[in-house]
Amino acid sequence: MVGLGKRLWVEGVGTAWVVFIGCGSIVLNTGAVQQGYGVLEVSLAFGLALVTASYAFGAYSGAHFNPAVTIGFTVAHRFPVRDLLPYIAAQILGAIAAAALLVYVASGRPGFELGASEFAANGFGEHSPADYQLHSALVVELALSFAFVLVSLMVTCRRKLRPIAPLVAGASLMIVYMVSIPVTNGSINPARSTGQALFVGDWALDQLWLFWAAPLLEIGRAHV
């Protein structure tokens, strides 16, 4: 059994990797006309980041990298309650570290303004990429958080599927991001939303509640 300290370190590093690669594909690839790649490319970046992190660190920590996943596994009695809060704290710290590194890198581009770019933060209303309102954002985050956690639970409970579990999880994340990016800029991960919101501040912090509430409301349904 890997010690808790090492597992927390791995969860933090893995979360940082997923957030930096995924959000970096939006923030750092900025042209004069449009910020970031298209929905497909950004979704692929998040999915591949999860696949690589899961294969690299899964044997140590279980490769959650997402508070919603950790809570889902806890509710399903497949993760110890005593480790729940430490895991979530490690994931949030990893996401914040990734966001801080992204700010530092992005600031090297002339004309970069953190507030103006919205920094890949999640939002709804006027802060939705396609101006989707609160009810649309809530439904999308609820449904897709449920689907993603459910897939994670199901694929890891089947021994024969465990070798390909990172691929399935990555593909699932890619699919849910393809749907959610136009609506909320794609969350499905409260840690990812928190890291970006802390640096954007203002509206991003005001709307952060949705990206914690949506996955938490759906966790019970993902119990299998």
Walk through the language-model features, giving the residues of each.
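Membrane-interface helix-loop junctions and terminal tails of multi-pass membrane proteins
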Residues: M1-H223
